[in-house]
Amino acid sequence: MNTAHPIRNPEDLEQFKGYYQYQKPHPRNYLLIILGLNTALRISDILNLRWEHVYDFQMGRYRNHISIIEQKTGKKTSILLNQNIVRALSWYQQSLSGSNKNIQPQDFLFCHKNENVPISRVQAFRLIKKAAERCQISGTISCHSLRKTFGYHAWQQ
């Protein structure tokens, strides 16, 4: 098994973040990458996020924090939803509204088109790997690279 690498080069990182936003627009995939890069959550925790974790349906607005219990550690975690995440969420939500998808609080954020089941870790890996390859980013890039990239750039600052 290859060890995942962070995306160290800032230009590569910007190109990677923009792949599903500009080169091949796909709001769901863009949100997955932005969430991973901005929260450092494990992919298992990201894929299990539901709309109720990020959106307050009673108030009609995005939450300030994601509060979850991490699958691996069992710890309760609260993570800030920064502007990059909120913009990605908004774009994704608008794309779903345009397709007449009625979002429910219990719906998974990253679900298949016609089912309320989360995409698999393998599918998440494929879309991350594809973006890295198309952006010609060297090194072993995987789902864990999002978490490592967060740590690397936080440490650099």
Locate each region found by the language model:
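N-terminal export signals and maturation junctions of secreted/periplasmic proteins
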Residues: 1-10
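C-terminal catalytic core of Y-nucleophile DNA break-rejoin enzymes
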Residues: 5, 71-90, 106-129
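Basic, Lys/Arg- and aromatic-enriched nucleic-acid-binding interface segment
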Residues: 10-39, 43
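Short, Lys/Arg-enriched N-terminal segment that forms or immediately precedes the first helix
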Residues: 12-20, 111-112, 133-136
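Short, basic (Lys/Arg/His-rich) helix/loop patches that form interaction surfaces
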Residues: 20-25, 126-157
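Conserved tyrosine-mediated DNA breakage-rejoining catalytic core shared by Y-recombinases
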Residues: 48-85
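Short, flexible active-site-proximal loops enriched in glycine and acidic residues
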Residues: 98-106
